[in-house]
Amino acid sequence: MDQKDTEMNEKGVSSSTSGVVVQVREKKGPLRAAIPYMPFPVAVICLFLNTFVPGLGTFVSAFTVLCGARTDLPDRHMCCVFWLNIAAAFIQIVTAVVMVGWIMSIFWGMDMVILAKGYREQSVPQQL
């Protein structure tokens, strides 16, 4: 039995005796990683703004970075992340004419709301 398990492991097939842990990480580009983790109501407002005025919600979210919002770019300075968000807003505004920016803006707002749900789960409950 042990020899059979060893043979299977050598072929790349995992057996029931050996544990395999698979970790999946999403690779994000710099613009996508610059989306800040915001409180849920702020993220919903940014989604609403991005839906009706492309890039406006992304522009507002850039200022939350200056207020201390965390991003997936911890090694970059706050001002660099701010300018990445401003660049994303500018791209959304310029390309909204051909509908690409509008769609990108809506998806950007949806990503903000998804990240805000993670922000809410990671926040520490306040004690009175």
Swiss-Prot record:
Keyword Membrane: yes
Residue ranges of the TM segments: 40-60, 88-108
InterPro entries, per database record: SPEC3/Stum
Keyword Zinc among UniProt keywords: no
GO cellular component: membrane
Disulfide bonds, paired cysteine numbers: none
Location, primary (coarse class): membrane
Pfam families tied to this protein: Spec3 (PF15795)
Location in or out of the cell: Membrane
Taxonomic superkingdom: Eukaryota
Membrane topology designation: Multi-pass membrane protein
Keywords: Membrane, Transmembrane, Transmembrane helix
Recorded family membership: Belongs to the SPEC3 family. Stum subfamily.
Protein name: Protein stum homolog
